[in-house]
């Protein structure tokens, strides 16, 4: 049986040829080193899969096996890709501190004594990068003490594991400790799919979904389509796993994966590391995918052994043929091929993660588009690229440059993904290499990746270029400056650009000038997938829930501006909606960053009233092309979006938002749905939605509706009033009629579609999913 240890984790000398005779399909194996009460249930999952296969009479993909293996009722569940809603039983829940506040507040209001599913909270989002790791961490602990105390005591009270500030980023902690092949995890962060690199189905959700699972209810997911990505060949030279997903994003665009799971297969999947697979799955969120996953293979065995989980590796090998691999002849809804032999490094951006440019074309493309060629900052790390392998490859480039007397031309920052990675690279020397290079090592946290960056080297409005190994590069996301041209690349390329200071530099063909005045080419990066001397766990930052939880008190000050107990939303009044004003007609990309900004607003994630003051302040108003300036329908005066929404609410007027395509893409933050509900919103009407945001809106009792004819979006004016007709007879698959009343001229009608099923309609009728849950208890 697995047991925890704080000593260095050493990989066995032979990590792949482990005998499996000691384990059988009936063996009892813990899911992780930290919990003694949760076991891997491969046998039950396989039984479910066999039931479904006998019903469907066809081979299954790996992703389908993991989904159907976790069905609540495999005998009677309707199963049709892209159509059915699946009722699933996840193995665990993971929450980061920014989204956990609202999730736990909702869980508390449900009145349930403890979580029914193993769950953890990870403190990674509230630490602002300023001067460096230790000082930034100390400052964050002081500033956020009230929130950390709330989360710590709530976790102790309700039986959740708690990872303290400084422990690392949620996805890296999950990969190191909780992920295992064949599992189903939901997490309140859009990059939860990172764990797909360890053969796990990991899906980002809103806090209300997490509350369902923590409460012991089945979790609902629309049966995804399956996109197969066939990898052939082998990467070499400057190419890294990050380039696979950067290339794929350019092929599919930011919405090409919507409603689908991306499953990787082919001979190429066995040619790189488990952590590299995690990088690829992590950024699958940027193409809208429900999740991404790799099938169980030897690289995963290596990683499990290196992280002290050899028993799980052996147990997975017992089930590899029947459960942890795709069936021969399994069919995908779409297949995309990528030849790793010919893949070159890519740089994606600016302003969107799907604008992919190969390094060989970067200089001419940048010049043609007027992108600033001088690279001001190179940033590596984050949840996407902070593995030991990433760090060693970046360090090898720096050592080569240093041998020629060069240091970083740009500001260079390193965000370690976890305390374990930080401690290991400190022991093995890479950390010193970064510091000698001129790099600033940040806290083990999200930092600049999510806008937690107090950037001082430029003024807001200054046009400049930064290159990171992060996953997302929306306008103003990293530093709050809309003029910053942010590009996403591998850690290797971000490091190269920091050395050269030139976005047009190609390390494959171009030379640098050393301190001696001689030209030289950088050597290809070298690195190792796993530390030869094992991982150093560093400081113990985990708080296990106590055995006696009855005496634990969770205190929320009634005067707090950070935390606020929730009041239930009112149920639907049972009537069609008439003469609703349009709060804003948003034009162009409207991500969750536009809807509910992060950065300085993160501190209000536990206080719905205060954070609602950021609602839609980044969205562009189609009337005037401005952000956060809309006209009050009744007074004619201009004001901010949240102020106008609150004025409508206080005057008793429901309102709607009109949105463009892929509305709500980006993070999983449910505040982007809680805020419009709190401010009196009734419906969000768009050309199309991103999956998580659409579900979050439903959970909070709002109506997410789509134009059946997208051209109707263009016909609506900001000063129109609208009716929503057919709500009293609303049913799955039944359209809603939008009657538009222009300020001048005749009324006209448009057809709106929706994706509600019967139970989701109950959420709307009751006022929220939480209200519906409480009505059943």
Curated annotation (Swiss-Prot):
[4Fe-4S] cluster binds at residues 383, 446, 449. Its EC number is 4.2.1.3. InterPro entries: Acnase/IPM_dHydase_lsu_aba_1/3 (IPR015931), Acoase/IPM_deHydtase_lsu_aba (IPR001030), Aconitase/3IPM_dehydase_swvl (IPR015928), Aconitase/IPM_isomerase (IPR050926), Aconitase_4Fe-4S_BS (IPR018136), Aconitase_4Fe-4S_dom (IPR036008), Aconitase_dom2 (IPR015932), Aconitase_mito-like (IPR006248). Pathway: Carbohydrate metabolism; tricarboxylic acid cycle; isocitrate from oxaloacetate: step 2/2. It holds the Pfam family Aconitase. Keywords: 4Fe-4S, Iron, Iron-sulfur, Lyase, Metal-binding, Mitochondrion, Transit peptide, Tricarboxylic acid cycle. GO terms for biological process: mitochondrial genome maintenance; symbiont-mediated perturbation of host immune response; tricarboxylic acid cycle. Gene3D superfamilies: Aconitase, Domain 2, Aconitase, domain 3, Aconitase, domain 4. This is Aconitate hydratase, mitochondrial. It comes from Candida albicans (strain SC5314 / ATCC MYA-2876) (Yeast). The gene is ACO1.
């Amino acid at each position: 049986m697995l047991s925890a240890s704080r000593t260095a984790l050493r990989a066995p000398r032979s990590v792949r040829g482990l005998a499996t005779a000691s384990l059988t399909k009936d063996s009892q194996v813990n899911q992780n080193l930290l919990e003694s009460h949760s076991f891997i249930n491969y046998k039950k999952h396989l039984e479910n899969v066999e039931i479904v296969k006998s019903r469907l009479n066809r081979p299954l993909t790996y992703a389908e096996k993991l989904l159907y293996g976790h069905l609540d009722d495999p005998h009677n569940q309707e199963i049709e890709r892209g159509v059915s809603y699946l009722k699933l039983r996840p193995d665990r829940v993971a929450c980061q501190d920014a989204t956990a506040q609202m999730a736990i507040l909702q869980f508390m209001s449900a009145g349930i004594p403890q979580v029914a599913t193993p769950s953890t909270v990870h403190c990674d989002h509230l630490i602002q990068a300023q001067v460096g790791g230790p000082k930034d961490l100390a400052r964050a602990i002081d500033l956020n003490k009230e929130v950390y105390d709330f989360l710590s005591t709530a976790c102790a009270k309700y039986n959740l594991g708690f990872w303290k500030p400084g422990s690392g980023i949620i996805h890296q902690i999950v990969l190191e400790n909780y992920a295992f092949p064949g599992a189903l995890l939901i997490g309140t962060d859009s990059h939860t799919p990172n764990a797909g690199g360890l053969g796990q189905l990991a899906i980002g959700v809103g806090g209300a979904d997490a509350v369902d699972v923590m409460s012991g209810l089945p979790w609902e997911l629309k049966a995804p389509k399956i996109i197969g990505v066939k990898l052939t060949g082998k990467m070499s030279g400057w190419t890294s796993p990050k380039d696979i997903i950067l290339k794929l994003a350019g092929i599919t665009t930011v919405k090409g994966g919507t409603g689908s799971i991306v499953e990787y297969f082919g001979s190429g999947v066995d040619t790189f590391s488990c952590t590299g697979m995690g990088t690829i799955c992590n950024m699958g969120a940027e193409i809208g995918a429900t999740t991404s996953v790799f099938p169980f293979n030897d690289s995963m065995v290596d990683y499990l052994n290196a992280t002290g989980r050899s028993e799980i590796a052996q147990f997975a090998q017992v089930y590899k043929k029947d459960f942890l691999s795709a069936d021969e002849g399994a069919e995908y809804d779409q297949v995309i091929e990528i030849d790793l032999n010919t893949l070159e490094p890519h740089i994606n951006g600016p302003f969107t993660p799907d604008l992919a440019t190969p390094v060989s074309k970067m200089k001419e493309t940048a010049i043609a588009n007027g992108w600033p060629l001088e690279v001001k900052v190179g940033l590596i790390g984050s949840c996407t690229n902070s593995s030991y392998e990433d760090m060693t490859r970046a360090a090898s480039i720096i050592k080569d440059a240093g041998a020629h007397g060069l240091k970083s031309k740009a500001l260079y920052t390193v965000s370690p993904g976890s305390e374990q990675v930080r401690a290991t690279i400190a022991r093995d020397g890479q950390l010193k290499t970064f510091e000698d290079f001129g790099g600033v090592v940040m806290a083990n946290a999200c930092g600049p990746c999510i806008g937690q960056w107090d950037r001082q080297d430029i003024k807001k409005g200054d046009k400049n270029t930064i290159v990171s190994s992060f996953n997302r590069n929306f306008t103003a996301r990293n530093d709050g400056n809309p003029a910053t041209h942010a590009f996403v690349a591998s850690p290797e390329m971000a490091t190269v650009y920091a050395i050269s200071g030139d976005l047009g530099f190609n390390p494959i063909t171009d030379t640098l000038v050393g301190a001696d005045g001689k030209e030289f080419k950088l050597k290809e990066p070298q690195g190792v997938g796993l530390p030869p001397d094992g991982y150093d766990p560093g400081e113990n930052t985990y708080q296990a829930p106590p055995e006696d939880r009855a005496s634990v008190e969770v205190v929320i000050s009634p005067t707090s501006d950070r935390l606020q107990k929730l009041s239930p939303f009112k149920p639907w009044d049972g009537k069609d909606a008439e003469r609703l004003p349009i709060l804003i007609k948003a034009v162009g990309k409207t991500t969750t960053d536009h809807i509910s900004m992060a950065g300085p607003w993160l501190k209000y994630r536990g206080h719905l009233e205060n954070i609602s003051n950021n609602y839609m302040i980044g969205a562009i108003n189609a009337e005037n092309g401005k952000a956060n300036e809309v006209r009050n329908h009744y007074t004619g005066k201009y004001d901010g979006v949240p102020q106008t929404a609150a004025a409508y609410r206080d005057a008793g007027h429901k309102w709607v938002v009109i949105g463009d395509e892929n509305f709500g893409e980006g993070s999983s933050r449910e505040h982007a749905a809680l805020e419009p509900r709190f401010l009196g919103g009734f419906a969000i009407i768009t050309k199309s939605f991103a999956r998580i945001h659409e579900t979050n809106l439903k959970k909070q009792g709002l109506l997410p509706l789509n134009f059946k004819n997208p051209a109707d979006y263009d016909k609506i004016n900001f000063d129109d009033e609208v009716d929503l007709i057919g709500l009293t007879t609303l049913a799955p698959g039944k359209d809603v009629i939008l009657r538009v009343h222009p300020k001048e001229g005749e009324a006209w009608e448009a057809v709106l579609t929706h994706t509600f099923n019967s139970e989701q309609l109950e959420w709307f009728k009751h006022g929220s999913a939480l209200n519906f849950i409480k009505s059943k208890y």
